[in-house]
């Protein structure tokens, strides 16, 4: 599922950088264009400090910018990944637009950047991901923030060889998760012992709710089902138990994927 998490990471970066550029311009530094001073899109006044994250987040972003502009990388003790596009802009242009900057930001820093946006900016991004008219704007924003945090932690768990069944989903907004799961999840999945068992299923549902691309949705479903099919019961046509129980995937959930999304048969 890593490639689908990467797809959503790139989508978040694209949507965030578009909103920031549209609202606050394309220069990372305040510049005078001859007709007046143009402020930076990283100006503190453009962001909310409701969770006391503004200064630390902007500092993290600025560290990447400074590193990209320092040819000898002598600034500070940290090392950062600098994309070829950011390196090009840092050395050949007089500004670095946000859609270039995000190519070198980690998923974590990008998520923090989203978290310090003003409410109206978050709403634009949340609405572009989630189009369900039955959810309020606040519910969409809450779901997007917690969902992005969860799949980021899930990716980090996979990358470090951790147990995917340890994913903590207790804080995921249940109403939105159930509403956007197309019937794949219900309230029982978020009660008692089912909370741990439903972790991977919740991750899959979140990915499907945020991808917003039919081809990618079908590809994700097909990948999950193909892998699950390797462990089906040998004497029936149903999805079997065993390793997939340990992963928190049920036959009911997998059959739901086939029925709800009409995935190609295998």
Residue ranges and their predicted role:
Residues 1-265:
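Long, contiguous internal "core" modules enriched in hydrophobic/ aromatic residues
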